Amino acid sequence: YADRILLYGPPGTGKTYAAATNKVGYTLEGEPNVYQITMTEDTASANLEGFYKPNSSGSFEWHDGIAIQAWRRGGRLVVNEIDHASPDAMTFLHAILDDKDIAQLTLNNDNKETVRPAKGFTVIATTNSLPESLPMALKDRFPVKINVDKIHPKALDMFPKSWHGVINDTSLSDDIETRISIRAWRE
């Protein structure tokens, strides 16, 4: 099965919605097993890997970052706007996105714990850019790339049926001046 998928396409087509809500991301008990983060130039690798945080006794405890939580639990990591990741975060993402048969990381915690992805771990990343515009080292880590050029039907269902035509027309408009993302319709 595909364990690393890149969803790309215009803003507002429901890429993140599709990545985060598909039932494949649920445990057998029906609990969500989806971990989501949006990349920015300010996102540090610690957000993905983990960090020390003071506890109630005044000492510091290690807290796994979102990517390591997903790794340990065999969850789905949704990386929104992956092309906006800081160089620090991108370096960490390269390791997370290695083939699961060879992937392993040594954490920066006190005992330098080595972790590997649990069975079921997947990554779905989103971008508004074409895959060809991504750095080769990133692009090559996604064996599956899907163009999402239409609004996700379930995302559209959040609105009254009478609005669907107008939302489709404005969200998918070729005119950048009149395009409105589906996210803007919810606000």
Report residues per predicted region:
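AAA+ P-loop NTPase catalytic core and its hallmark functional loops
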Residues: 1-162
